[in-house]
């Protein structure tokens, strides 16, 4: 799991299960009854490389077939899996561009996410996402803005 987010570090990795919640697929801050539509979010603490990391794994039940697993952004993001995917693409584009201009050829990886402005239903919220490349960590402000029709606009700016 850690290798999906960060490059190998040569140290033994230890993972601890920290909990699971059945949450709304578009708002991870909302717990929902397991009998209702949603997604399971497993929180895994990873230790052994760099600093401790909080990993989010989304589990999609598929009836009698094995569940589908998807790694989410590390840390405390409350964005749903689809919004996280959009934000990751934007953060990686910015982080890799900055790294390339500085002569770094290593791809960036996400180190952490946290909520800056709390999420309230129907309102915009902000998160801080950290990405690392060539041992340089950059922070990005990720802004999520709900729009008419149920869509959410995602924007990213450097926040160093």
Enumerate the language-model features and the residues they cover:
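Cysteine-centric segments in proteins
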Residues: 1-160
């Amino acid at each position: 799991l850690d290798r999906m987010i960060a490059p190998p570090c040569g140290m033994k990795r230890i993972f601890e299960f920290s909990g699971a919640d059945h949450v709304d697929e578009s708002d991870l801050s909302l717990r929902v009854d397991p009998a209702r539509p949603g997604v399971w979010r497993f929180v895994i603490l990873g230790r052994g490389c760099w600093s401790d990391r909080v990993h989010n794994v989304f589990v999609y039940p598929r009836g009698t077939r094995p569940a589908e697993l998807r790694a989410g952004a590390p840390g405390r993001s409350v964005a749903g899996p689809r919004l996280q995917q959009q934000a990751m693409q934007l953060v990686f584009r910015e982080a890799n561009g900055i790294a390339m201009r500085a002569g770094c050829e290593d791809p960036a990886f996400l180190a952490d996410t946290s909520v800056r402005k709390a999420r309230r239903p129907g309102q915009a919220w902000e998160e801080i996402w950290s990405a690392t490349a060539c041992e340089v960590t950059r922070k990005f402000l990720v802004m999520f803005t709900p729009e008419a029709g149920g869509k959410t606009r995602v924007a990213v700016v450097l926040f160093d």
